[in-house]
Swiss-Prot record:
Pfam family, one: RNA_pol_Rpb6
Gene name of the encoded protein: rpoZ
Catalytic activity entry: RNA(n) + a ribonucleoside 5'-triphosphate = RNA(n+1) + diphosphate
Enzyme class: transferase
Coiled coil: none
Biological source species: Shewanella sediminis (strain HAW-EB3)
EC number: 2.7.7.6
Protein name, per record: DNA-directed RNA polymerase subunit omega
Subunit structure: The RNAP catalytic core consists of 2 alpha, 1 beta, 1 beta' and 1 omega subunit. When a sigma factor is associated with the core the holoenzyme is formed, which can initiate transcription.
One of the record's GO molecular function terms: DNA-directed RNA polymerase activity
InterPro entries: DNA-dir_RNA_pol_omega, Pol_omega/Rpo6/RPB6, RPB6/omega-like_sf
Keyword Nucleotidyltransferase annotated: yes
Keywords, in A-Z order: DNA-directed RNA polymerase, Nucleotidyltransferase, Transcription, Transferase
Disulfide-bonded cysteines: none
Length: 94
């Protein structure tokens, strides 16, 4: 198991409390949403991977926010396309 000191991660984020929030969000993305880690997994748990990504400056609150906004935009575009396809199908039937 890799030993991770949180001091480097804290220095990247600014304070322990925000670091915990960012690490939890990123770990959830990796574990639940299936996002790919940006570092080697090395049999580490998602929380350790998230801390290592933060340490290296790969993940910040801003990058997580931007990623979530992009995901929402993609989901909305897919929904609009699906509704348009349904509406077009109804117009072709009439």
């Amino acid at each position: 198991m890799a030993r991770v000191t949180v001091e480097d991660a804290v220095n990247q984020i600014g304070n322990r409390f925000d670091m915990i929030l960012v690490a939890a969000r990123r770990a959830r993305q990796i574990a639940v949403q299936g996002k790919d880690p940006m570092v080697e997994e090395e049999n580490d748990k998602p929380t350790v991977i998230a801390l290592r990504e933060i340490e290296l400056g790969l993940v910040t609150a801003d990058t997580l926010d931007a990623d979530e906004r992009q995901t929402v935009r993609e989901r909305e575009a897919a929904e609009i396309a699906a509704v348009a396809a349904i509406a077009e199908g109804r117009n072709n039937v009439i």
